Amino acid sequence: MSLYCGIACRRKFFWCYRLLSTYVTKTRYLFELKEDDDACKKAQQTGAFYLFHSLAPLLQTSAHQYLAPRHSLLELERLLGKFGQDAQRIEDSVLIGCSEQQEAWFALDLGLDSSFSISASLHKPEMETELKGSFIELRKALFQLNARDASLLSTAQALLRWHDAHQFCSRSGQPTKKNVAGSKRVCPSNNIIYYPQMAPVAITLVSDGTRCLLARQSSFPKGMYSALAGFCDIGESVEETIRREVAEEVGLEVESLQYYASQHWPFPSGSLMIACHATVKPGQTEIQVNLRELETAAWFSHDEVATALKRKGPYTQQQNGTFPFWLPPKLAISHQLIKEWVEKQTCSSLPA
């Protein structure tokens, strides 16, 4: 028995080492592509490209979900030539990742203004016909993508949007130039370097010990509730942001909080969602909704939330004029935050 356990442990260590080694190799390869323009250009030769049009990714429908097709450099050059575009437009692409086999992945938007083409935007309908797909708004398609494509396209859209918004130096007013990977932009007149940034957002599930507080904004789909969320102000820690947001939005004071996880979110322009659990002071649970921030907020029981987690929205209006209570889809960190609370409540209610 001890011999078997020893072999099993060694095998586990071996596979963990291989996983770590693959991750380190992949990470350092991406670092090299970001730092070395020549290496990145070489990677484009054997890489694959995800296409966008005005920040909407090219998608194809398959078995009740969307797939994000990839195109080789040769296919992309042929496509650009067919639509009268210079292949130099490929220099607008940005690096978004790579496979374990070091196939580099890039994203290129064919609908945004380009410094390499007079007629910058390619016509969307003709492109969709040629590519046998559709350019679909990412917000609408995100939850019908697999996890890998959702992550890659979210990264791509945020990077493409950032580059489109930072084509000029804020100090000199002169055009900035991106490196091949798109990991930075430089102003040639003063050498100021601009790096893509994300805005930190604290998303918090508030609990009073037995219930959790969920809210909705007027922009949410009908019937959907989620955890409280707000941008970090300059000078604030995450903890201070959470306490302020809870006080501002629902008039409650946080007693304790615990970090859960984080997630990149491409909307509205690239955010880092920092998810936490928070507990309010006992006996101080009366909600005072700030209508400038929220449409409504309410306490929900464990059973109500557990049932809502099983629903898939959005829903149509019921005969009585209401919409069923549902929660954000699984890919959203708010869903995972709420799910963990339900699981913890379930475990704590079980007999010892």
UniProtKB/Swiss-Prot annotation:
Function: NAD(P)H pyrophosphatase that hydrolyzes NADH into NMNH and AMP, and NADPH into NMNH and 2',5'-ADP. Has a marked preference for the reduced pyridine nucleotides. Does not show activity toward NAD-capped RNAs; the NAD-cap is an atypical cap present at the 5'-end of some RNAs.
CDD domains reported in the protein's UniProt record: NUDIX_NADH_pyrophosphatase_Nudt13
Tissue: Highly expressed in metastasis-suppressed chromosome 6 melanoma hybrids.
MF GO annotations: metal ion binding; NAD+ diphosphatase activity; NADH pyrophosphatase activity; NADPH pyrophosphatase activity; pyrophosphatase activity
The protein's required cofactors: Mg(2+); Mn(2+)
Main location: mitochondrion
InterPro entries found in the cross-reference section: NADH_PPase-like_N, NudC-like_C, NUDIX_hydrolase-like_dom_sf, NUDIX_hydrolase_CS, NUDIX_hydrolase_dom, Znr_NADH_PPase
Xref: NCBIfam families: PRK00241.1
Motif (Nudix box): 216-240
Cofactor annotation comment: Divalent metal cations. Mg(2+) or Mn(2+).
Keywords tagged on the record: Hydrolase, Magnesium, Manganese, Metal-binding, Mitochondrion, NAD, NADP, Transit peptide
Superkingdom of origin: Eukaryota
GO cellular-component term (any): mitochondrion
Ranges for domain Nudix hydrolase: 196-323
Family in the record: Belongs to the Nudix hydrolase family.
Gene name linked to the record: NUDT13
KW Transcription (keyword) present: no
Location of the protein in the cell: Mitochondrion
Protein known as: NAD(P)H pyrophosphatase NUDT13, mitochondrial
Transit peptide: 1-20
Reactions catalysed, as given in the entry: NADH + H2O = reduced beta-nicotinamide D-ribonucleotide + AMP + 2 H(+); NAD(+) + H2O = beta-nicotinamide D-ribonucleotide + AMP + 2 H(+); NADPH + H2O = reduced beta-nicotinamide D-ribonucleotide + adenosine 2',5'-bisphosphate + 2 H(+)
GO biological process, one term: nucleobase-containing small molecule interconversion
Keyword hit for Endoplasmic reticulum: no
EC number of this enzyme: 3.6.1.22
Protein species of origin: Homo sapiens (Human)
